[in-house]
């Protein structure tokens, strides 16, 4: 670490700068929907209870992602503030969930709320689900940041004078377009124990694609010291959400037991599109250490919120109640750790 650390030589050195961060983010749980349930008598209370299989039966694990920043310094403006243009990629998180359920008390009284009369689904005793969700974001921002004040002149014990950066708060303004993509897929497979799939089975698939285009409005507040910094950065982007969904269902039932199970086939496809209001917002709490004039290590904690999207488990239409099923009122929330570096040249 050099003895002399002036603001002119130590910070924002060079015309280009870049950053790379590894993200480890958790995702909010699915919209809760009951897929199947079976009533039973509680011998302790004498009351009726339900064994249920829902879309939130299993939690999500933390998924890795990345944030990459590439920026170009545009020099100072007439008020001596630093100007820059930067591109940021934020995303790469992919979440998967696999779950299953067997009716614990046989198949005589299993209720399927999402498809009470659909052949191949109603009356099933075995259920398997698969879920996938991902997130990616691209943004192009103009950044205007305050510079540190005048350097301090410090005399060493040997009588030599040296320049040192004066610590201070560095607010910044961030504005620019942002594009984000959220894709979700859900698949349900049903069967009966000991029965051939050709006699009884069902497969239901939901695909949801969301593209959000908005304008970033945000800022940054950094407490800059000679060799370390800490602060926060936040951005909010009101957006247009371009949503599309695709659903398919195929089922067959030719069993005669238990009585009352619908017989026949299920076979339908449904597509829908919509443009709706959306929102993208993120907040980062960060701290970093300047190792050299051109390189710093950084750690942080991140929050990310995406709203106005079609999440897969909000689109269930297996009973075909809606002609063009599409619910764009979904949202997802992410939070987790980040660590990486910043450098300039």
Label the model's feature ranges.
Residues 1-77, 81, 86-88:
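Short glycine/proline- and aromatic-enriched beta-strand/turn motifs that initiate or cap beta-hairpins
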Residues 1-17, 146-168:
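Outer-membrane beta-barrel biogenesis signature
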Residues 16-20, 81-87, 155, 169-177, ...:
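Transmembrane beta-strands of outer-membrane beta-barrel proteins
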Residues 20, 68-72, 140-144, 175, ...:
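Residues on the lipid-exposed face of transmembrane beta-strands in outer-membrane beta-barrel proteins
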Residues 24-28, 89-95, 146, 177-183, ...:
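Transmembrane beta-strands of outer-membrane beta-barrel pores
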Residues 31-39, 46-61, 94-135, 182-211, ...:
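Extracellular/periplasm-exposed beta-strand and loop segments of Gram-negative cell-envelope proteins
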Residues 78, 150, 227-230, 294-297:
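Repeated loop/turn-to-beta-strand initiation elements of outer-membrane beta-barrel proteins
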Residues 330-345:
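Outer-membrane beta-barrel "beta-signal"
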């Amino acid at each position: 670490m050099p003895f002399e650390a002036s603001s002119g030589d130590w910070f924002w050195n060079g015309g280009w700068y870049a950053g790379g961060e590894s993200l480890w983010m958790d995702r909010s749980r699915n919209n809760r929907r009951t897929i199947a349930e079976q009533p039973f008598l509680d011998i302790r209370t004498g009351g009726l209870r339900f064994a249920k299989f829902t879309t939130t039966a299993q939690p999500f694990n933390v998924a890795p992602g990345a944030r990459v920043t590439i920026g170009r310094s545009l020099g100072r403006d007439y008020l001596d503030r630093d100007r820059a243009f930067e591109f940021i990629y934020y995303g790469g998180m992919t979440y998967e969930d696999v779950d299953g359920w067997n009716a614990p008390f046989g198949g005589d009284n299993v209720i399927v709320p999402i498809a009470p009369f659909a052949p191949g689904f109603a009356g099933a005793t075995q259920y398997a689900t698969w879920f996938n969700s991902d997130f990616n974001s691209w943004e192009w921002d103009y950044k205007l940041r305050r510079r540190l004040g005048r350097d301090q002149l410090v005399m060493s014990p040997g009588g030599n004078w040296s320049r040192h950066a004066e610590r201070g708060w560095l607010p910044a303004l961030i504005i620019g377009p942002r594009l984000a993509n959220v894709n979700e897929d859900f698949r349900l497979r049903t069967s009966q124990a000991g029965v051939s799939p050709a006699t009884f089975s069902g497969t239901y698939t939901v695909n949801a694609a969301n593209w959000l285009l908005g304008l970033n409005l945000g800022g940054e507040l950094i407490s800059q010291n000679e060799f370390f910094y800490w602060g926060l950065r936040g951005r909010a982007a009101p957006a247009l959400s371009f949503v599309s969904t695709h659903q398919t269902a195929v089922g067959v039932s030719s069993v005669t037991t238990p009585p009352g199970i619908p017989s026949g086939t299920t076979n339908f496809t449904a597509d829908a599109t919509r443009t709706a209001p959306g929102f993208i917002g993120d907040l980062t709490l960060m701290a970093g250490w300047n190792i050299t004039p051109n390189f710093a290590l950084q750690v942080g904690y991140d929050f990310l919120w995406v709203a106005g999207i079609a999440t897969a488990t909000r689109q269930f239409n297996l009973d075909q109640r809606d002609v063009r099923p599409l619910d764009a009122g979904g949202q997802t929330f992410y939070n987790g750790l980040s660590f990486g570096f910043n450098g300039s040249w």
